[in-house]
Amino acid sequence: MAEGRGSRERPDVETQKTELGALMGTTLQRGAQWYLIDSRWFKQWKKYVGFDSWDMYNVGEHNLFPGPIDNSGLFSDPESQTLKEHLIDELDYVLVPAEAWNKLLNWYGCVEGQQPIVRKVVEHGLFVKHCKVEVYLLELKLCENSDPTNVLSCHFSKADTIATIEKEMRKLFNIPAERETRLWNKYMSNTYEQLSKLDNTIQDAGLYQGQVLVIEPQNEDGTWPRQSLQSKSSTAPSRNFTTSSKPSASPYCSVSASLIANGDSTNSSGMHSSGVSRGGSGFSASYNCQEPPSPHIQPGLCGLGNLGNTCFMNSALQCLSNTAPLTEYFLKDEYEAEINRDNPLGMKGEIAEAYAELIKQMWSGRDTHVAPRMFKTQVGRFAPQFSGYQQQDSQELLAFILDGLHEDLNRVKKKPYLEPKDANGRPDAVVAKEAWENHRLRNDSVIVDTFHGLFKSTLVCPECAKVSVTFDPFCYLTLPLPLKKDRIMEVFLVPADPQCRPIQYRVTVPLMGAISDLCEALSKLSGIAAENMVVTDVYNHRFHKIFQMDEGLSHITPRDDIFVYEVCNTSMDGSECITLPVYFREKKSRPSSASSGAVLYGQPLLVSVPKHKLTLESLYQAVCDRISRYIKQPLPDEFLSSPLEPGACNGSRSSYEGDEEEEMDHQEEGKEQLSEVEGSGEDDQGDDHSESAQKVKGQPRHKRLFTFSLVNSCGTADINSLATDGKLLKLNSRSTLAIDWDSETRSLYFDEQESEACEKHLSMSQPQKKKKAAVALRECIELFTTMETLGEHDPWYCPTCKKHQQATKKFDLWSLPKILVVHLKRFSYNRYWRDKLDTVVEFPVRALNMSEFVCDRSARPYVYDLIAVSNHYGAMGVGHYTAYAKNRLNGKWYYFDDSSVSLASEDQIVTKAAYVLFYQRRDDECSSTSSLGSFPGSDGGVKLSSSHQGMGDEEAYNMDTN
């Protein structure tokens, strides 16, 4: 891809803004192509054209010119141009339709060597169609049947068909077009599934990240290499799938997909191959497995294979699997009589059936682990946000599963319309009973029986004191955590002393503080005055942003590389200094290009020069002094006859102090003159400058290491050149300079290793400030039930005042369910800041007494025991999910890490990773599910084994995150 084209093809900024603005609202259409652009380049373009009405400062000025499109910040490997993992839309990149991309490409070009990042729009959802751009393609492992060790990786869109894969594999393995082939999924060393429907898309086929596909060419005699293996694999005529060489009588293992096996398989999973029929569920209707469970496998201790960033799903499923009332409901096939296929809010019973089959497999006692591929496929059909292979939130998936199961199993076939009623002064008990009965008239399922409780919500108008009391059902409690007030930042301080390396510091600053707070904190550690600091965000060898002191720290994300420069506001003699950004560039010879033809490298500089001495010579010397630590000066015999000889500073259009500022409407015009040298002209700068020019004239000087260019703020486009006649340069605080090196000079005189070297301050090695002591779960509950005032953007409409009011609002708990799910709200974010609260929340493993938080004083005692925990390790958007769960059959705790299951002890469970807690209510009397459906809190629960004896030989487990 060529670099930027000439500016004559580029319309004025207003036209650009209008044309792109109209295109940015383009609706996503299936199969359409959209392009990724690095958000930093796009933000620079928006500033240049004044795209946002609130950011119109210096619109169209040359220093804001974005230069050619540069997506290098999105690549983990610049050679292969592979996208970094976990990129976030709008934060890391923007998506533009093809027409918008073509316009930008025509106007600005693209950095040399970069290919456009083009992606297709794919459609998700079975009933409600949802289009989205498929940013991350699916990686498949491809091999040929005769040489399974030669595996090639290829990327495909989920909208591609199986035929597309076959065509690519024929090409890769040199298989003639006339030769018949078959495609197989390879799940384990000996388990295969034939992909016979070539018109199926990858999404429909349920292929997942890293899936191995095998292409099998037909023998010349018309037989197939795998045919003999298939005939040996099974004797069951109704089943094309086996995971063992011996037949199985289990109808659960009989599915429609064609699978064969190469021999014995002890741990393979039937979940790989469950066929999905568009006209029905595609799952077996019962669980009457005749094959006895293994005596060595405890039912329920079944790991779940990671299908590609699906640890979040595995964690949620393990917690649900160990929720005894729900699991027993499915194992006893009670769900079959309650499936509601006609519920418009449901999923035709398919989520319930998929979940039932998975639970039966996990509790069969036959498998140490299974791959929940079909369950994930079913979830993705109805909830497109979970259909890909990017990390998701276990609590969000949990909420979808519970809601999906509820609607699929809702016993109410026709929901009545019910008018909501306010309390109007009636007793709470009356209003609560009415609200719960109305809820049950529309919602009656095992999920309601097991997980639903009742909130009391009280709103008070600040003007008329109107009190509104309502009661609403809930399925889980989302509890806020006390917010931390500080944040830890790691920054680099670049001292003014050129012989000092940059120093990395770790500082504590207010979470919602300003840049000035960062400078003050850094000043205390370094001894450098805060007023002499300039805070910058360095990205791709340039300043992405130079911050003002009053800007918020919320603009700085953990991903940013923050460099703080010590600058001189005044010189030694007290005169005012100007501080200029300076970039390093290696000049390339590109005479036909309107762009700079230069590549940025190294760490950018902020160079301070006295205004009254701002000549080219003094600027050159100031830069040389600033970089003296990592450059070598030329040898004495490397002289030039004059420091200002033509070509030394590629001067053309001079910039003089006192001249009227020139309008740079066409950068190309300036570019055409870069190689010319302007005459010295009239000396109107005074005797001092004339004398200075005479002083250096004729003196032998060292060979110049670099030349100067006045560039845009990205360093990607030349704007002007600098005067070579000793007169003062007309530069201001918005000017940006580049020092251009040729390749040979850079390799001879520039020390790359030393230029990147830095020191670490003691703050980096010292233990971080001890965090606040662990928070008790009761503190989170108290915070949840604390009265608050509604925000101005979230007011309440007062029926008495007839207007919206910032009322006070208070939540209370009225009744609690059998299974209490507690979601600890660890993730918080705003437009600029995304954070995870890693506070340790101390929650009881046994005897959590919630009675004191229930405002219904006539209610029974609410005492709970912990049964499962979903853990999250890492930061927001990345990391790894696991689970702790208590097996109901032996009363022991286990740690579930995808396919791995290991014994755990109670003292391992309470950690800062705990994210979702599952509690089961203690019941005074044993009651079965026949009591389900009564008022929450008034019924008993299913009494299960609750052995709390010693764990026995607990195993320490070291998590290996993916």
From Swiss-Prot:
Residues 225-249 have a biased composition (Polar residues). Residues 485-774 are annotated as: Interacts with DUSP and ubiquitin-like 1 domains and is required for USP4 activation. It holds the Pfam family UCH. The active site is at C311 (nucleophile), H880 (proton acceptor). Residues 928-937 have a biased composition (Low complexity). Residues 384-386 are annotated as: Regulates ubiquitin dissociation. Residues 302-922 form the USP domain. This is Ubiquitin carboxyl-terminal hydrolase 4. It comes from Mus musculus (Mouse). The gene is Usp4.
